[in-house]
C-alpha cells in the first residue's frame, strides 16, 4: 500500500543537514506500525512527506513516496488534495492547533465529506459525522457536535480529530503523537480506539511517538529512527526482547518500571 524509498529531506534554513536521510520501508494493507524516536529524529518530517505536506519553498527532497502507486512527492497539488482525507488522513499531536477555534466541531468533522463528496446532503452528512464520532469514542453526540473546541477537554478534542480523520474511511491513518499531551487514562482510551479501528475497519495506521512503551502497547511492528535514519525495523516483540541497535537499547532502558520509580523515590530522600 505504501512504499517509501530512499527519502531524504533538507530544510532550506539548515542547508548542511538532512532532517531525513535515506529512509526506506514498505507498509502492507491494514498494517499497524509504530514509528518511534526522540524529538528531532525525523519521524514527523517523514510523516509530512508521506501525507504530501512538504513544500518546495521550505525544503528540498529526494526519493519516492508512493501510496497505492501514486507519488506523494513532486505531484500536482490537486492530486494530493484528492488523496488527503480519502485514502489518507492525519491526526496531529495538538488538536487545538488542528481545529478552527471559531467554528463548531460538527462542520469541522464533516469537512472531508464537504470537499470530496459535495453531492451528499446535510442530513446524510450529519449522520456520517455521528457515525465517525461514535467510532472515535465520543458520546452525547448532538451536544458535542454543536460545541466549540475550547468547550471540550483535551481527550474529547483528540477524539474529534480522530472522527474528522475517519469520516471518509481512509485506508491509511497517520497518528502523529496523538496521546503525548493527554493523561495516562485518556491515553489508554485513545490507543484502544486506534487498535479497534485497525481491527474492525482494516485501516492501516502509522503511530508516531517518542514513547517506545506506548508504541509497543499498540503496534505489531516497530520502526526506530535516530538522526534522520532508520536504525531498526522489525516485529515489536522481537525488538523489545532482542534489540540490535544501541539506540534502541537505550530507548528500552528509558522505559519506566516499578523498580526505577521506587529507586528514584529513595534517592530523593
Predicted regions and their residues:
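Hydrophobic anchor residue at the start of the ABC signature
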Residues: 109, 162, 186, 190
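Conserved ABC ATPase "signature" region
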Residues: 71, 123-143, 252-253
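ABC ATPase "signature
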Residues: 233-234, 242
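Conserved ABC transporter NBD signature motif
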Residues: 59-71
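A short, surface-exposed alpha-helical micro-motif characterized by mixed small hydrophobic
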Residues: 215-217
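A short, proline-enriched helix->beta-strand linker immediately N-terminal to the Walker B motif
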Residues: 167-171
